[in-house]
């Protein structure tokens, strides 16, 4: 079902969307009136989330923020729920050597690229508490968790897909909305991942190089220009990645997998011998069985100096 259009199925599911909306409003109100207790912490918490389902590019922003504050001398940690991982009980401290099937792809990717402590727990508030106690951090960034109201936060950052925006503007399951669009009025910052809108900060994803998953060898962006390649993506919005490869002049054979999909070696065996291109998020799940034909596209997030000035002022 397409969550960006208003088809028959979308309308048929509207009664369920109404129930979802009322339940989410009630739940938030119960936290606001202290019927449910909010867990407070010894150090600031920055939440990077969204109000829709589907990929909006939160993780590159989390990595960028973590690296920035590390350079400022902060002891930074990151918490996540660990979607796609097999760890379901209590907290898991993720390092560069953690099994990706245990942690999930995003926690391991952050641990590898940002080189800092990462804690996974379905209960984000508990993840924050455990990270403070075990790793002596003084700033925590939550990858997602905008709707996890049990976790107190100092800064809220909402990330929006600049192309799809809010889809058909229906609530789940008829549409992509987790919360009302008005929720954006209460967050501290709105980041747009495509295009410019008043009141929103624009993030640029800078394409760097292709990196061989097995050897670490790097090749320039035009290396596969004019070649036939397989494009593999198990992310929230794979078409964005495929469009990027096509703009690089690649004759693409796309293969879409579910978000957080756990790859098996057999998934990436094709009859031809064309190169296989993937995202960094896909890469961490393929390292154990990688071959010389597997490459990932290295990207780097960039936000304006003005954004960081305003962020530090609020923090």
Swiss-Prot record:
GO terms for biological process: lipid A biosynthetic process; lipopolysaccharide core region biosynthetic process. Keywords: ATP-binding, Kinase, Lipid A biosynthesis, Lipid biosynthesis, Lipid metabolism, Nucleotide-binding, Transferase. It comes from the Bacteria. Pfam families: LpxK. GO terms for molecular function: ATP binding; tetraacyldisaccharide 4'-kinase activity. Pathway: Glycolipid biosynthesis; lipid IV(A) biosynthesis; lipid IV(A) from (3R)-3-hydroxytetradecanoyl-[acyl-carrier-protein] and UDP-N-acetyl-alpha-D-glucosamine: step 6/6. The keyword tRNA processing does not apply. It catalyses: a lipid A disaccharide + ATP = a lipid IVA + ADP + H(+). One of its GO terms (cellular component) is plasma membrane. Its EC number is 2.7.1.130. ATP binds at residues 52-59. Transfers the gamma-phosphate of ATP to the 4'-position of a tetraacyldisaccharide 1-phosphate intermediate (termed DS-1-P) to form tetraacyldisaccharide 1,4'-bis-phosphate (lipid IVA). Belongs to the LpxK family. This is Tetraacyldisaccharide 4'-kinase.
């Amino acid at each position: 079902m397409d969550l960006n259009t208003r088809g028959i199925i979308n309308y048929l599911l509207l009664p369920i969307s109404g129930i979802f909306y009322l339940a989410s409003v009630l739940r938030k109100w119960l936290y606001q009136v202290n019927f449910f207790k909010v867990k407070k912490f010894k150090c600031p918490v920055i939440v990077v989330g969204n109000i829709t389902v589907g990929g909006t590019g939160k993780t590159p922003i989390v990595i960028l923020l973590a690296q920035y504050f590390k350079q400022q001398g902060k002891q930074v940690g990151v918490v996540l729920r660990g979607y796609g991982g097999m760890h379901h009980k209590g907290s898991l401290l993720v390092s560069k050597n953690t099994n990706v099937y245990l942690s999930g792809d995003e926690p391991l990717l952050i641990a590898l690229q940002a080189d800092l402590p990462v804690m996974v727990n379905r209960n984000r508030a508990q993840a924050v508490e455990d990270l403070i106690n075990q790793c002596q951090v003084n700033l925590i960034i939550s990858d997602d968790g905008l709707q996890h109201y049990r976790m107190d936060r100092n800064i809220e950052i909402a990330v929006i897909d600049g192309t799809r925006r809010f889809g058909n503007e229906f609530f789940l399951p008829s549409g992509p909305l987790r919360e009302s669009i008005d929720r954006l009025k209460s967050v501290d910052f709105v980041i747009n991942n495509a295009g410019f809108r008043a009141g929103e900060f624009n993030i640029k994803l800078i394409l760097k190089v292709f990196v061989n998953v097995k050897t670490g060898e790097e090749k320039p962006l035009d290396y596969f220009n004019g070649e036939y390649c397989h494009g593999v993506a198990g992310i929230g919005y794979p078409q964005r990645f495929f469009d990027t490869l096509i703009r690089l002049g690649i004759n693409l054979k796309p293969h879409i997998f579910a978000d957080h999909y756990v790859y098996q070696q057999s998934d990436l065996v094709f009859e031809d011998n064309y190169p296989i291109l993937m995202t960094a998020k896909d890469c961490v799940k393929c390292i154990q069985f990688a071959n010389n034909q597997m490459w990932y596209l290295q990207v780097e997030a960039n936000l304006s100096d003005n954004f960081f000035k305003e962020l530090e002022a609020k923090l």
